[in-house]
């Protein structure tokens, strides 16, 4: 879902 994509992006950004 849309939230899954948001979480995915948030995880990547948070990993920086």
From Swiss-Prot:
Keywords: Amidation, Amphibian defense peptide, Antibiotic, Antimicrobial, Secreted. Expressed by the dorsal and submental skin glands. GO terms for cellular component: extracellular region. InterPro entries: Aurein_antimicrobial_peptide. GO terms for biological process: defense response to bacterium. The keyword Secreted applies. Pfam families: Antimicrobial20. The modification Leucine amide is found at residue 16. It is found in: Secreted. Its main location: secreted. Bacteriostatic action for Gram-positive bacteria. This is Citropin-1.2.
């Amino acid at each position: 879902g849309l939230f899954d994509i948001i979480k995915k992006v948030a995880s990547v950004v948070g990993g920086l």
